[in-house]
Swiss-Prot record:
The gene is trm1. One of its GO terms (biological process) is tRNA N2-guanine methylation. It holds the Pfam family TRM. Belongs to the class I-like SAM-binding methyltransferase superfamily. Trm1 family. Dimethylates a single guanine residue at position 26 of a number of tRNAs using S-adenosyl-L-methionine as donor of the methyl groups. InterPro entries: SAM-dependent_MTases_sf, Trm1, TRM1_arc_bac, tRNA_met_Trm1_C. This is tRNA (guanine(26)-N(2))-dimethyltransferase. PROSITE patterns: SAM_MT_TRM1. Residues 10-400 form the Trm1 methyltransferase domain.
Length: 407
């Protein structure tokens, strides 16, 4: 491997970790850092993503969900900030950091040493991530507990290798930034990349995209005779982030597909979206015409409530997190949404009110009214004007019309 040329460095801090990064001197445009211009990729705007990751990694260890060794694998490490933080802040006994950029390998090693990691507690690779994951899946000198996929763009090209490397008790985490594709804005690309039959842009496409991603991961897992269970799945800023626990076995895989894969439909006459099994008729469910928002897609739960509660408890204690208030706010919202997320799509109040020709009511008032009617209802993290509820769409429409007409 050629020896990387020296680079000028700067220093920053995240959480409890000190991180050396390439000097941003020549990577600033219009007063903002352009991460792709750095000699080694580092995006300070993703600190929130990494803070959530550290809390999730800590919760996996604290709850016992991590049944394998305490080894974390970062497939696209960049400067090594995520892997280092897994060791320093989440207590992982070993971190494996990989990046195809040789300068990244050098910086990741520097950051590991700067944060006091012992030589045997980390490994650095300079490989194409898929080839390394397939290699480790065959060799597997050390079982991997947490596999983290955070590429530039779509995680789709890396899901197969990550699931090949996974075993019983492994958790696979991934970030997707190709939202225009996942949400149906680029339908042909979505069909190719995520193996969809159909996808369309709708007022609730933020959730559609996340469920498309989970559905793709589930189908790739099934090809390995494995099943996945979402522990945490969310939308923030310009990306999706999901964590799935892996189980082995063809029967588990079959059950997962049967119970959690279906189609998402949008009802244009009412503005409501539905998550339907393949046994359910979309026309009957919508009461008329419908648009297929995504097929196939994940229609099961978007999170594990006990795991989210454990994350919340850790976040409250983690006073060193730079984005702690935002982390707590997200986790509180996700904790409320989790039990309502199976077979449910959030309601866009703007869309429903527009179809009903009434003013858009306040979200808090809709939640209050639906609860008074005996249903569960919470705000969603996907949208500032969205509500998640177990109320039938007819009752939702009644609530929106009542409040929208009086306001």
């Amino acid at each position: 491997m050629p020896v990387p040329s020296p680079m000028r460095l700067a220093v920053t801090h995240e959480g409890r970790s000190i991180i050396y990064i390439p000097s941003p001197e020549y990577a600033v445009a219009s007063g903002r850092l352009e991460p792709a211009w750095l000699e080694v990729f580092y995006n300070p705007a993703m600190e929130f993503n990494r803070d959530v990751s550290v809390v999730a990694a800590s919760a996996l260890r604290r709850t016992g969900l991590l049944t394998r060794s305490g080894v974390a694998f970062d497939a696209h490490a960049g400067v090594g900030v995520r892997g280092v933080r897994y060791a320093v802040e989440a207590g992982y006994v070993k971190v494996i950091m990989n990046d195809i950029n040789p300068k990244a390998s050098m910086l990741a090693a520097l950051n590991a040493r700067a944060n006091g990691l012992e030589p045997g507690s980390y490994m650095i690779f300079n490989k194409e991530s898929n080839s390394l994951m397939f290699h480790l899946s065959r060799e597997r000198p050390t079982p991997v507990s947490l596999i983290d996929i955070d590429p530039y763009g779509s995680p789709a090209p890396f899901v197969d290798a990550a699931l090949a490397l996974s075993g019983k008790g492994t958790v696979v985490a991934m970030t997707a930034t190709d939202l225009a594709v996942l949400e149906g804005g680029k339908a042909r690309a979505a069909v190719r990349r995520y193996m969809l039959r159909s996808v369309s842009k709708t007022p609730v496409s933020k959730e559609t995209g996340l469920r498309v991603l989970l559905g793709y991961v589930a189908r790739v897992a099934a090809a390995h005779d494995k099943a996945v269970k979402p522990l945490l799945a969310y939308y923030a800023d310009h990306y999706y982030r999901v964590y799935v626990a892996v189980e082995r076995g063809a029967r588990r895989s079959d059950s997962m597909l049967e119970e959690n894969l279906g189609r998402l439909v949008y009802c244009p006459e009412t503005g409501v979206a539905l998550a339907l099994s393949y046994a359910e008729d979309p026309a009957s469910a919508c009461g008329g015409s419908y648009v297929v928002a995504a097929d196939p897609a994940w229609i099961g739960s978007l999170g594990d409530q006990a795991f989210l509660e454990a994350m919340l408890n850790i976040a409250v204690e983690a006073v060193w997190l730079g984005t702690r208030p935002r982390v707590e706010k997200l986790l509180n919202t996700l904790h409320g949404e989790a039990p309502l997320s199976p077979r449910s799509i959030y309601v866009s109040l703007t869309s429903v009110a527009s179809k009903a020709r009434v003013n858009t009511p306040k979200k808090s008032k809709v939640v209050e009214l639906l609860r008074s009617m005996g249903y569960r209802a919470v705000a969603t993290h996907f949208s500032g004007e969205g509500v998640r509820t177990d109320a039938p769409w007819g009752e939702v429409l009644e609530a929106v019309v009542k409040l929208g007409s009086s306001g």
